[in-house]
Amino acid sequence: MRYTLLIFVLSLCTAFTQEVVKEGLLDPITITATRFNELISDVPYSVDLIEGRDILEDMPRGFPSVFASNPGVQVQKTANGKGSPFIRGFTGFRNLLLIDGIRLNHAAFREGPNQYWGTVDPLIASRIELIKGQGSVLYGSDAIGGTVNVITKDSSPLSYEENRSFVEGQIMYRGSTAENSHTGRIEGLVGIGQKTGVLMGYTDRSIGNIRASGIGELPFTGYSEHGMDLRIDHYFQENVHGIFSFQKFEQNNLWRVHKTIYSKSWEGTSVGNELRRSGDQSRTLAYAQIKAEDLEGPFQRIHANLSWHNHEESRLRIKANQKTDFQGFDLDSFGSWIQMESDTALGKITYGTSYYQDRADTFRSDLDKDGNVIRKRIQGPFGDDSTYEQLGFFVQDIIELNDRFDLNIGSRFTHIDANIGRYENPQTGLQDQLNNDWDNLSNSLRGIYKKNDKLNIYAGLSQGFRAPNFSDLSRLDSARSNEIETPSPDLNPEKFLSYEIGSSFDDEKLEFGISAFYTDIRDMIVRTPTGRLIEDEYEVIKKNGSEGYIYGLELNTSYHINDRLNVFGALAFNDGMVDTYPDSSLLVRSEPVSRLLPVTTNLGFRYDLSDSQWVELSSIISDRQDTLNTRDRSDTQRIPPGGTPGYAIFNFRYGLQLNEQTLLTASIENITDQEYRVHGSGQNEPGINFIFGASLKF
């Protein structure tokens, strides 16, 4: 607890300041909170907005890193390229990721931190919205800790005069020393003003082995990734907008090093025994959307979507005894939704329906040391020849009770069908199949009181649920250190109820935001040891019935001392207990929630040297996390004995806007070359890191 006093003292020093959502933006807008454009100050949620300009200045090395300085978010990395944000105590499939309102979550998402958020290129985003604790009313299953919506760049034909042709481009670069990384992106923009625009982009990123302070180079932490994207915007009329988009992103040679003999012990962590565990993954998304606004009749606005999403993953593992296996999956997700909005005497009503169907094939082959197939298994990481369908109907009404108080009421009905065509029965070792379905009704009630133009107070409660997916029902693959998870076909949905109260204040100089939350957990699905040993790993299965809670506090502050100097700070912590099965006796024990966010503080200032130059000094201060449950303590490859040490990281950035077309940035991250690891991660973070970025428009 050595950093606790420092954290709270520094936090009190900035107790009347709040970090600006976007510098210079007077009325930031959110789409995700209510499914239509709304001022952030008018929604009864905790909303974090990351603008494209922020991404361009920071040039993060991957999508999860975008959230590294976000209060209340802990970006765990099982391995380099495999970041998984924890939002209000939840990660993986208990957070929902959207791209332009389309679910990236699919039925193959596995328990705990996973690598799937790494398939999003942050450089395609015009902004990223994070709604914390939103619940399941608007978007369905999974949105427990938070909902993230990546709003992609459009081709902006409305920014140009009618019938005027335009051609533009942009080149971006980022290089760093401690990762030996290089990122390049090129964009091209063509179109006809007020009618049609086409935006094309390509990103290539090469990441070398990390150089960590104290323990040196981390072998096999390097990887490569690249992506392409296309977006076409066409205005049929001034109020009717059509969109077609295509995105493809690939990651290659991602090692899970902590499982192998090449990992390095730190603060007493154990070293894996596998000779290799590496994989590739790719994601493809194509969609068409139509938006119509200012309509006459019962609907004033309509937004509809058709999408196809493909995700492929493969993994090669060589065990200590030379036994080798190659496995993976190929999943197609077909999605459609439509939402309508009506301005009525009963309020602004949003209602609609959504349907997603996931189809997946999986494989696993056992190989000899020469790479020859000696056995083909019944399934891959989860059941083969599987389908998963989600049908939902939702309604939301925002009622303006008076000039100061708005009430937000919502409800959603969801029906889910799961069909596992083939899976390996853990008891018999023979092929089996399963069919299951579930219904859920989730509700939300929230209100916001606007004291005046500067101050508001909001409160509410939101129900959420997460239905069992392919991975829950039929997984046959590694879990944590020295564990293997086997199929668990008899599961039911998890249920959550989140309570939240918060407030924000905003005037010309001071901004302040605070939110407190409490999430009640019912029937959560948890891994449970059986006592069996399978292929040198301890078997775990999944069970419903875990009950518990998570609560926390988030504080953001910022103060403009003058036109050039802004100081900012943030404070966040989580705590909670949940029922667990620590051993094969099946006796229930209440233990701390796994991988809890330690008390974390962000502090810094930004000074504009001139209209074209700025400097920023920031810090991330994290307390020691020694509140562990049984499975945390047994995860010895990732969590040191007794817990993860605290740390204080300081970063410096400089920016120079040479002209309207050219931006140059230079940064020093981890100035003091601190040895540190984000709690629950499988590797240490880079030591002192020199970063150079450039953007040129033409």
Where are these regions (language model features)?
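Signature of Gram-negative outer-membrane beta-barrel scaffolds
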Residues: 350-452, 477-480, 583-588
